[in-house]
């Protein structure tokens, strides 16, 4: 299963991607092969780092979100996990998922006010 998560302002596919990762209230977890929502993780007081580690532990392939702070960026962008980060700000999760699968979203290469990585990105296209 190709796991793609979306950092959103609610639990439903129609809910918007949060403007900043730190503002998300939910992580929606999709099967990228079927585009079906398979799990919703509520923030419920979890820190950005805890959410990032949840994504790493589930071996997510991609995260659709807004800009990330350095601490969580370091987790999801680590060579060990190499979670591709797509900027889906301004879009509902379901639309952002389709756009990510069609390589129509920009990759987030750097954290907020920090130095990112060149990293490895899944099937990246420079269209």
Located regions from the model:
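Active-site-adjacent beta-strand anchor residues
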Residues: 65-66, 86
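Non-catalytic interface/targeting segments
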Residues: 1-46, 50, 57-58, 78, ...
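Short, glycine/polar-rich helix-capping loops at beta-to-alpha or helix-loop-helix junctions
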Residues: 68-75
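Proline-aspartate-enriched helix->loop->beta-strand connector
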Residues: 59-63
């Amino acid at each position: 299963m190709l796991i793609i998560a979306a950092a959103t302002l609610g639990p439903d596919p129609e809910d918007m991607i949060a403007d900043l990762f730190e503002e998300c209230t939910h992580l929606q977890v999709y099967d990228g092969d079927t585009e079906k929502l398979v799990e919703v993780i509520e923030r419920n007081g979890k820190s950005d780092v805890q959410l990032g580690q949840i994504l790493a532990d589930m071996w997510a392939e991609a995260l659709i979100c807004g800009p990330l702070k350095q601490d969580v960026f370091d987790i999801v962008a680590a060579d060990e996990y190499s979670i591709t980060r797509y900027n889906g700000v301004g879009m509902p999760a379901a639309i952002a998922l389709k756009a990510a699968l069609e390589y129509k979203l920009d990759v987030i290469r750097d954290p907020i006010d920090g130095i990112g990585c060149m990293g490895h990105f899944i099937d990246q296209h420079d269209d």
